[in-house]
């Protein structure tokens, strides 16, 4: 795997993204100043070893090892999802959105572009669109619980915030641990407990719950 870093002085990130895509066999997966997205096939250990993730330095991260049920099995359809062309908004999602195509058509008519047919991508674009209109992350996520139909739990990452939302039916699991200087979220409690050498206290968010942490 290759990683390249360069400086771009213009604020027109969509122009940059489209310019990169003119290079043959090149696809842009994310853009921004605070987040770096790694998308590939394989389990967490395989991807971490391939990209040297143990050497990454940062304040927070999100990831998702999933079984594709309604999308292709390829890098483009892997999580996390980025909201093209906004910088530093990424989402991982567990569940199904039943009004995906309706919301997608609305956003496409507003000029948004989608890079996959996975319903998870709509959440990233939806949140980025709300925030571009001046709505903060927490309120954007609360709005999503009423405007996105289906069963879902998702996590959003920006350059300085981490948020989780659970739909009104709360059918998709989420477990949270909040320590003095760390927050961990996972679909299964064992995934969190395997990280910490000491006993921890976790909790399950309620239905229609949203939490946002500053990082």
Role assignments for model-derived ranges:
Residues 1-215:
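Conserved short alpha-helical segments that host acidic/polar catalytic motifs at enzyme active sites
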